[in-house]
Amino acid sequence: MSMFCFQCQEALKGEGCTAIGVCGKTSEVSNLQDLLVYVLKGISICQNEARKQGVSRKEADTFIMDGLFMTITNVNFDDSRFIEKIKAGIELREQIKAALENAGAKLPENLPDAATWTAETDEAIHLKSHGEEIRATKTDDIHSLRELIVYGVKGMAAYAQHAANLGFENPEIYAFMEKALAATIDDSLTIDELLALTLETGKYGVDVMALLDKANTETFGNPEVTTVKLGVRKNPGILISGHDLKDLEELLVQTEGTGVDVYTHCEMLPAHYYPAFKKYEHFVGNYGNAWWQQKEEFESFNGPILFTTNCLVPPAQNASYRDKVYTTGAVGFPGFKHVTENAEGKKDYSEIIAQAKTCAAPKSIESGELVGGFAHHQVIALADKVVDAVKSGAIKQFFVMAGCDGRMPNRNYYSEFAENLPQDTVILTAGCAKFRYNKLPLGDIGGIPRVLDAGQCNDSYSLAVIALKLKEVFGLEDVNELPISYNIAWYEQKAVIVLLALLALGVKNIHLGPTLPAFLSPGVAGVLVEKFGIAGVGAVSDDIAQFMSR
């Protein structure tokens, strides 16, 4: 096989991609991603020792975080960026070793290859990336748990980076990420120890989502109930996709007064819920649906597109928008223009704005409105109304349907599930999974919409806060006693950290779909079923009947 990757839900045949990624990444990029993670594990070993000696490097924390983010599904397809990052990682690792030596400390003997391997040429890097020791091909329980931890830490890194971009950091989160990475190449650890580390990963997942929630709300205000337009205006526009709100803010500031409108796409939709962005009259609305429909929607948008994070889908060779796509941050694709920070940490979007002015206005693909903004602060403000609806029987059950969307036909399950839920139920959602049902006419219960959108995938934290608040209000001992069921759709590694966070909070009986992760060995899957009641999804009618009988 020329590659092996099973980190996302669309792994080929439910087993793994071996020639080219279903996501579109080449075998070369896949192998380089694996090698970068390998190098990051080596850096983590050295950084852990340096931390003990008081000579750890802050730039190493950031480097590891950024490097992990680059390897998340649909973030970066540019092999040159990975080669550059690997070279920089080796150099940084050796600098940490030198700092340890200068401090009179010694690294452990018999360091693993990840902490000692070096290369100076692109050829040497490519050669190493094809090595069997780099790939996660084994499916025994130990390796399965290692991959589960790595993917959780990747999701953690993404959320940590968004918070850091806004000036909010937690050194304990960096230290844990490095501890966890190093542990995944420690052959002395037992299955029980790795299971404990998996739950600890979930605990820090809660912490990092709380940190990002704090960063977003203290910077941009608490999300509030908001109506978002789905139509278009006659001005040229820029479409911004991804999750990074700082990038959005900079783009809005720089486009103000230019005659160029700004539209959100996919996971950027919830930005409309934040008070700070409502002052921008040219922040028009949302264009399109979930990430996997971008090839068609980008053609009709006409203007340039800015990717701040995933999910980027490689465009067709003859796509009319190929020369209009810009990337920034961890995102990359060969031939796309990449916007970097200057020395002051600012980004210059003048080129994308200039190009937008030469483009036709977006073509209308739909009309109407969406309502969202039901993050924890807003829902808790409405707590009396919600509690009364539950006590009166108007609301029988809540369904947490957070997570990701994807292109596989079996994801129609989530639309059908939402449509067939009893009228006395309410959906709590976050992430792009919402696009399977947020435009369905599901109505409301006494003025409470039957779909309450908290925001982006990281705002699954809000759903947990809401659940814990309801537990308190109803005087319950266990969050699982609430009339809340969990039917989560996953796709990539941020969904993994959300899942682990829910488990760390004690949530049980989560249904995960549309398929279970390929990286879960039968033994590990069995433990998740036995200890936490994790289950897959089946027929819509059967699943609803099972949920409603609890």
From Swiss-Prot:
<feature type="binding site">
    <location>
        <position position="23"/>
    </location>
    <ligand>
        <name>[4Fe-4S] cluster</name>
    </ligand>
</feature>
<comment type="similarity">
    <text>Belongs to the HCP family.</text>
</comment>
<feature type="binding site">
    <location>
        <position position="5"/>
    </location>
    <ligand>
        <name>[4Fe-4S] cluster</name>
    </ligand>
</feature>
<feature type="binding site">
    <location>
        <position position="494"/>
    </location>
    <ligand>
        <name>hybrid [4Fe-2O-2S] cluster</name>
    </ligand>
</feature>
<keyword id="KW-0408">Iron</keyword>
<dbReference type="GO" id="GO:0051539">
    <property type="term" value="F:4 iron, 4 sulfur cluster binding"/>
</dbReference>
<dbReference type="InterPro" id="IPR016099">
    <property type="entry name" value="Prismane-like_a/b-sand"/>
</dbReference>
<feature type="binding site">
    <location>
        <position position="492"/>
    </location>
    <ligand>
        <name>hybrid [4Fe-2O-2S] cluster</name>
    </ligand>
</feature>
<dbReference type="InterPro" id="IPR004137">
    <property type="entry name" value="HCP/CODH"/>
</dbReference>
<dbReference type="GO" id="GO:0004601">
    <property type="term" value="F:peroxidase activity"/>
</dbReference>
<dbReference type="GO" id="GO:0005737">
    <property type="term" value="C:cytoplasm"/>
</dbReference>
<feature type="modified residue" description="Cysteine persulfide">
    <location>
        <position position="404"/>
    </location>
</feature>
<keyword id="KW-0411">Iron-sulfur</keyword>
<feature type="binding site" description="via persulfide group">
    <location>
        <position position="404"/>
    </location>
    <ligand>
        <name>hybrid [4Fe-2O-2S] cluster</name>
    </ligand>
</feature>
<keyword id="KW-0004">4Fe-4S</keyword>
<dbReference type="GO" id="GO:0046872">
    <property type="term" value="F:metal ion binding"/>
</dbReference>
<feature type="binding site">
    <location>
        <position position="311"/>
    </location>
    <ligand>
        <name>hybrid [4Fe-2O-2S] cluster</name>
    </ligand>
</feature>
<dbReference type="GO" id="GO:0050418">
    <property type="term" value="F:hydroxylamine reductase activity"/>
</dbReference>
<dbReference type="InterPro" id="IPR011254">
    <property type="entry name" value="Prismane-like_sf"/>
</dbReference>
<dbReference type="GO" id="GO:0042542">
    <property type="term" value="P:response to hydrogen peroxide"/>
</dbReference>
<dbReference type="InterPro" id="IPR010048">
    <property type="entry name" value="Hydroxylam_reduct"/>
</dbReference>
<keyword id="KW-0479">Metal-binding</keyword>
<feature type="binding site">
    <location>
        <position position="457"/>
    </location>
    <ligand>
        <name>hybrid [4Fe-2O-2S] cluster</name>
    </ligand>
</feature>
<protein>
    <recommendedName>
        <fullName>Hydroxylamine reductase</fullName>
        <ecNumber>1.7.99.1</ecNumber>
    </recommendedName>
</protein>
<feature type="binding site">
    <location>
        <position position="17"/>
    </location>
    <ligand>
        <name>[4Fe-4S] cluster</name>
    </ligand>
</feature>
<comment type="function">
    <text>Catalyzes the reduction of hydroxylamine to form NH(3) and H(2)O.</text>
</comment>
<dbReference type="InterPro" id="IPR016100">
    <property type="entry name" value="Prismane_a-bundle"/>
</dbReference>
<feature type="binding site">
    <location>
        <position position="243"/>
    </location>
    <ligand>
        <name>hybrid [4Fe-2O-2S] cluster</name>
    </ligand>
</feature>
<dbReference type="Pfam" id="PF03063">
    <property type="entry name" value="Prismane"/>
</dbReference>
<feature type="binding site">
    <location>
        <position position="8"/>
    </location>
    <ligand>
        <name>[4Fe-4S] cluster</name>
    </ligand>
</feature>
<keyword id="KW-0963">Cytoplasm</keyword>
<feature type="binding site">
    <location>
        <position position="267"/>
    </location>
    <ligand>
        <name>hybrid [4Fe-2O-2S] cluster</name>
    </ligand>
</feature>
<feature type="binding site">
    <location>
        <position position="432"/>
    </location>
    <ligand>
        <name>hybrid [4Fe-2O-2S] cluster</name>
    </ligand>
</feature>
<keyword id="KW-0560">Oxidoreductase</keyword>
